């Protein structure tokens, strides 16, 4: 679907997909719309929202509000990832690895939008299995959330940071 981008204050909002759904009742079908959006500050905070309403603008507005409420902080290393990560949700699997300066965001569809709003500028990624946008977004955010900085790993293992990094 169209990738609509808006900036409100310091937050970057992206519309990933809008879908028309139908509820079948005795008198026929009742149509409504769903919207999937991601919101981030470009500095490591990202959230997604899924809204549903009878009209498209209302669905988008609901999704944006949910995305702002469900933001998580991601530990970035400059403008790339700390280390390679995998994420899984339902039938979707994602793999992301840090890339050198100037690589850009090598990602498709819904994963690209999540990485752009979270502040990642150099990454190599691949989605496996189902490419359902909702599941890909959830898997991507789970993977980013599971990423740990060397300081966190060192503290957990009871070692110094230079011992972790080699």
Curated annotation (Swiss-Prot):
An example of a Gene Ontology BP annotation on this entry? translation
Name any one Pfam family assigned in the record.
Ribosomal_S5
User: What keywords are annotated for this sequence in UniProt?
Assistant: Ribonucleoprotein, Ribosomal protein, RNA-binding, rRNA-binding
Q: Which GO terms describe its molecular function?
A: rRNA binding; structural constituent of ribosome
Q: Which GO terms describe its cellular component?
A: small ribosomal subunit
Domain (S5 DRBM) ranges = 11-74
Q: Which family does it belong to?
A: Belongs to the universal ribosomal protein uS5 family.
Q: Which PANTHER family match?
A: S5 DRBM DOMAIN-CONTAINING PROTEIN
Can you state the subunit structure given in the record? Part of the 30S ribosomal subunit. Contacts proteins S4 and S8.
Q: State the function annotated in the UniProt record.
A: With S4 and S12 plays an important role in translational accuracy. Located at the back of the 30S subunit body where it stabilizes the conformation of the head with respect to the body.
The UniProt comment on domains reads: The N-terminal domain interacts with the head of the 30S subunit; the C-terminal domain interacts with the body and contacts protein S4. The interaction surface between S4 and S5 is involved in control of translational fidelity.
Q: Which protein is depicted?
A: Small ribosomal subunit protein uS5
Q: Which organism does this record belong to?
A: Idiomarina loihiensis (strain ATCC BAA-735 / DSM 15497 / L2-TR)
């Amino acid at each position: 679907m169209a990738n609509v981008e808006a900036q409100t204050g310091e937050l970057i909002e992206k519309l990933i997909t809008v879908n028309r759904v139908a509820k079948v009742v005795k008198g026929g079908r009742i149509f409504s719309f769903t919207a999937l959006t991601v919101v981030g500050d470009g500095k490591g905070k990202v959230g997604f929202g899924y809204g549903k309403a009878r009209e498209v603008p209302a669905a988008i507005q609901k999704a944006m509000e949910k995305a702002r409420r469900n933001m998580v902080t991601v530990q970035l290393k400059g403008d790339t990832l700390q280390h390679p990560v995998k994420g899984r949700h339902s039938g979707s699997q994602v793999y992301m690895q840090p890339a050198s300066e100037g690589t850009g965001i090598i990602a498709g569809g819904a994963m690209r939008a999540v990485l752009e709003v979270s502040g990642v500028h150099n990454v190599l990624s691949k989605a496996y299995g189902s490419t359902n946008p909702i599941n890909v977004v959830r898997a991507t955010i789970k993977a980013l959330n599971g990423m740990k900085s060397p300081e966190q790993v060192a503290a957990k293992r009871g070692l110094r940071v230079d011992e972790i990094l080699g």
